[in-house]
Amino acid sequence: MKNEKTYKIGTLTYTTTGIILLSIWMLWGDLIWSLKDRAVGPSSTLLFKQIIDSEFLYGLIIIAFPNFTNIFLQPIIGFVSDRHRGRLGRRIPFILFTTPFIVLGLYGLAFTKLFGSWLHGVCPSLSLSAAQLIFFGISWVFLDFGSTLAASLFTALANDVIPREVIGRMFGLFRLVSLGVGMFYNYCLIGKVESHTMWIFFGVGTAYGLGLLLLCLKVKEGKYPPPEELPPLPNGKKRTILQTVTTNSVIYFRQSFSMAYYRWFIVATVIANLAFMPINGFSIQYSKALGIPTDDYGKYVVFSYCISLFLSYFLGVLSDKFHPLRTGIASQLVYAVLMFAGFFIMINPKAFSYIFILHVVISGCFFTFVASLNSRILPQGIFAQFISAIGIVSAAFNMIAGPVIGKIIDVAGDYRYTLLLSALISTASVLLLYKVYRDFLKYGGDKNYEAPMPE
């Protein structure tokens, strides 16, 4: 036992047994988060399309609105949680805070049709679709508020408690769990969403509430150095609330965006993630336009997830070995070629099945490769703050991109343009990631890299 290998991160020390137990509970948390994440997107899309058929409104409400709230909410939660020191740690208290909002939002979506029908009966001048859209919107606001705040917290918690020696593998396992949940949803549930909306959303909401509570009880954070204190005012005066908010905002934006290295990294990360939005956001509608049954669409997803499931752990190992920047660039390059080719050939159900499966597999490879990239590049002391800064820029891009893509499809009447857009964005991401890679080498590369700390 004396020679048992130990793993350290901050004040936390794990034996091999401890790492296994940590892995179990973090994977449990990822299972619950993935269930919510995998189910909400497609289920909300199908529910929304049952209520009203407008790609512009879909892009505005489902895509643009969450990204608009990201701009304001993620910086707050990132900045505050980085500097919070409490009995339960700096991430877990905020995870607990967000959970009721997510559960209420999911329950609201479950009863959207029921409440909407009731409102239409009470107020006949309001159409049934408008009444249901009102309740959908209210529930979506609750769900979005909680999800936006929680999105970066789980990643930040993983960054705080998982030792660097195993973080790539751990994120590979996270990906494996996420894919498994996606397979279950798309094989067993997606074909039933339109007829069993209430039970699916209600079940996911209940599982999320109980599951996240258990995660917060079982995972323990370490001790953190005291946060940087605000400089004193002249004559020892106390700051007003407005002065405190203003000073913290200046610190936030200075630290997050003052260094060119991190500005390039943020933009590269955002553009790389944006490359998959055109297909991910409109693939269900594309399949329906080609006459593909929803069950068949779900089977394509399940098959592609089976491939990704097999690859996920090994991709994590490759990421640890070759660095996420290199593997991320390679996967984006392959994806760009696929999308350019797909634009010319994806014109019938058979072509859709092949290109869509490859899209899911290759985009999945990218996300697995770069899952630990933020932990390998960003300063640990203000990690969640940087994640939120990425979220701000990502939200700004996505907020514009969602409705624009929807409008392009409405005008062109052809979903094939989603592939061309993905190809162009992916090509841009390759160039941006290569720029970041060159700067990474200047700061020490694989052996001597230390994340530079902004002043």
Task: Describe the residue ranges of each PLM region.
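C-terminal transmembrane helical hairpin of 12-TM major facilitator-type secondary transporters
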Residues: 325-367
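Helix-to-loop junctions at the C-terminal end of transmembrane segments
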Residues: 72-87, 311-324, 409-410
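Glycine-rich segments within core transmembrane alpha-helices of 12-TM secondary carriers
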Residues: 69-71, 168-190, 391-402
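Helix-loop boundary and gating motifs at the non-cytosolic
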Residues: 3-69, 261-268, 272-290, 297
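Intracellular juxtamembrane helix-capping segments at the cytosolic ends
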Residues: 149-162, 365-379
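A membrane-interface helix-boundary motif in multi-pass transporters
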Residues: 90-92, 191-206, 407-426
